[in-house]
């Protein structure tokens, strides 16, 4: 067993010859010598020999007689011949076979050990004392199963964070030579990553979402020149002078919903599905304010349903189960989702044609002075053809309806569950102190979106450089895939994280919460979405109080956290109340 001892000594001490020839060893960082494991080495060696002897004996006992004869003949002829040629003729062949097997096993162990030490040295050379993020305790199979089949993914990330008490952790995934996949829930690190110009969206991740727009490059999922063109084309629509017109439309649509729907529910003393109603209201506001398109009631319900079906398939099912894209024709649900996608594209085409028709009737060839999203898209020459214009319209519908609607629905649900908070907000809104009312409304909105974030997380990004978390001595290496889970971002290291308490935001710094992402890929329509949510909340909470009649259930699909079958009942507040 002299060879084993030589291999062991080689692993313990650095290669002196390599030090002079290879600059890799010539690093300024002092590397500790490995401890003496001679006792452990002898124990492993003896244990391996004992195991080999027992294994060989058991194999021989179980071999058929004719195989035993062949095995003995192999030992006597071939092994004896090789041992004679190597000068080991006096050693029994069976001992040589056991030695060879033992040598291979010990060589594998030593090589693995040396490789591990080399990796540690290289890591120390590159990153110093900063370690990679810790692994989540969830095993590989559980991680894959949850990501592919479960609608409880946000709570899975939250549990992973709680298990190891860390807001940053790695996921165990079975991809050889693949980039590291890291969940990041630390607010400062998330901001640094998203604001870095080298951070880009992961194209494989967003390819499925792009299927909603039939795979055409668009403002939401694309990178590079096409995204810059789309962003530059629609940005003028969100200038303050144009937002005022959108706010006015938001007020009109809200009043119309109150008069035609909410009062009807109250007159009949019946409850209503808050999620469904907010989706229809948001869709109506968006189409009129952004696309100058007034929807009929039947069309409103139909497009709302088609949008939900297409979003669930392409932004969740197909994203997490790639086989559905290849073999989806065999599934009725996929065929239905593709039909919904076609209908959404037809609807977007109608919006585009409707705008052009109005422009022709007005006998105008100039760009409208009151720029809307549709006028920016239709009149811009930055688009190659109408397919890209239609794709951007569809993506505005996808990104601007359900997220905003369920933010409203969840906040109203929490206010109904917390009548004291609702009463304080109503008193502030009906009082004479506008600043206090605005601040309290902001706090309620922040707390509602913190407790019930409308999206499960910020989509996967690929980092363009190493990011260091100095407080935790953690490094996220260049090329890693980053995911920002909302429930970790909004709950980790927060006192009473499951409690709806808007007062926590009074002394909280502005940087403590990301509502609409940040950096160059932030939400282009965030000003319109915030204005809509703020106005609807203020209008409803000032004059009405709500009661929860059915909590329903929570579901994560199409990238949105939805309240399903959640029903509220409204009651008008008397002036003297």
Model-derived features: positions:
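Conserved cytochrome P450 K-helix E-x-x-R motif and the immediately C-terminal K′/meander segment
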Residues: 144-169, 346, 350, 433-472, ...
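C-terminal helix/juxtamembrane-tail motif
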Residues: 58-61, 68, 89-92, 561-577
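Cytosol/nucleoplasm-facing, intrinsically disordered, low-complexity tails
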Residues: 1-67
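Central I-helix of cytochrome P450 enzymes
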Residues: 282-286, 344-349, 377-429, 448, ...
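Cytochrome P450 heme-binding "Cys pocket" and the immediately downstream C-terminal segment
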Residues: 421, 526-563
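Cytochrome P450 heme-thiolate monooxygenase catalytic core
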Residues: 96, 100, 202-211, 245-406
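Conserved cytochrome P450 K-helix/beta-meander segment immediately N-terminal to the heme-binding cysteine loop
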Residues: 484-508
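N-terminal membrane-proximal hinge/A-helix region immediately C-terminal to the signal-anchor transmembrane segment
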Residues: 74-215, 225, 229, 251-256, ...
């Amino acid at each position: 067993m002299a060879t084993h001892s030589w291999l062991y000594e080689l692993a313990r001490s650095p290669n002196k010859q390599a030090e002079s020839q290879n600059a890799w060893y010539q690093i300024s960082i002092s590397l500790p010598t490995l401890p003496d494991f001679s006792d452990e080495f002898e124990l492993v060696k003896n244990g391996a020999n004992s195991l080999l002897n027992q294994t060989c004996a058991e194999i021989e006992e179980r071999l058929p007689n004719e195989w035993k004869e062949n095995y003995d003949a192999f030992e006597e002829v071939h092994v004896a011949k090789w041992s004679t040629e190597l000068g080991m003729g006096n050693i029994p062949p069976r001992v040589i076979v056991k030695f060879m097997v033992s040598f291979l096993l010990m060589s594998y162990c030593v090589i693995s050990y040396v490789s591990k030490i080399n990796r540690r040295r290289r890591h120390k050379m590159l990153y110093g004392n900063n370690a990679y993020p810790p692994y989540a305790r969830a095993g590989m199979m559980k991680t894959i199963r949850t990501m592919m089949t479960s609608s409880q993914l946000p709570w899975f990330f939250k549990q992973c964070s709680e298990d190891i008490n860390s807001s940053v952790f790695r996921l165990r995934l079975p991809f050889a030579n693949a980039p590291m996949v890291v969940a990041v829930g630390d607010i400062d690190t998330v901001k640094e990553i998203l604001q870095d110009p080298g951070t880009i969206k992961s194209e494989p991740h967003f390819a499925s979402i792009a299927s909603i727009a039939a795979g055409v490059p668009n403002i939401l999922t694309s990178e590079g020149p096409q995204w810059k063109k789309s962003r530059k084309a629609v940005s003028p629509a969100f200038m303050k002078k144009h937002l005022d017109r959108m706010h006015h439309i938001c007020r009109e649509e809200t009043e119309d919903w109150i008069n035609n729907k909410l009062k009807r529910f109250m007159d009949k003393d019946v409850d209503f599905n808050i999620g469904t109603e907010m989706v229809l209201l948001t869709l109506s506001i968006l189409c009129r304010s952004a696309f100058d398109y007034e929807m009929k009631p039947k069309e409103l319900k139909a497009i709302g349903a088609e949008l939900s079906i297409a979003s669930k398939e392409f932004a969740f099912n197909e994203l997490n189960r790639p086989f559905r894209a290849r073999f989806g024709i065999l599934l009725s649900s996929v065929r239905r989702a593709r039909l919904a996608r076609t209908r959404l594209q037809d609807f977007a085409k109608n919006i585009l044609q409707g705008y052009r028709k109005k422009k022709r009737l007005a006998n105008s060839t100039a760009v409208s002075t009151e720029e809307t999203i549709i006028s920016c898209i239709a009149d811009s020459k930055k688009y190659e053809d109408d397919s890209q214009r239609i794709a951007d319209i569809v993506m505005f519908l996808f990104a601007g309806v359900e997220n905003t609607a369920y933010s409203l629905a969840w906040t109203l649900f929490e206010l109904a569950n917390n009548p004291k908070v609702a009463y304080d907000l109503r008193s502030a809104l009906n009082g004479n102190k506008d600043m206090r009312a605005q601040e309290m409304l902001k706090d309620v909105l922040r707390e509602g979106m913190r407790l019930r974030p409308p999206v499960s997380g910020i989509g996967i990004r690929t980092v363009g450089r190493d990011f260091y978390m100095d407080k935790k001595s953690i490094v996220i290496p260049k090329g890693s895939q980053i995911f920002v889970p909302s429930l970790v971002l909004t709950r980790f290291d927060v006192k009473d994280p499951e409690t709806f308490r808007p007062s926590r935001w009074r002394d909280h710094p502005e940087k403590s919460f990301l509502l609409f992402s940040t950096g160059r890929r932030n939400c282009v329509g965030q000003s319109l979405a915030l204005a809509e949510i703020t106005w609807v909340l203020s209008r409803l909470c000032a004059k009405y109080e709500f009661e929860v009649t059915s909590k329903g259930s929570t579901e994560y699909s199409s990238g949105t956290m939805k309240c399903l079958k959640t029903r509220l009942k409204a009651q008008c507040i008397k002036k003297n109340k």
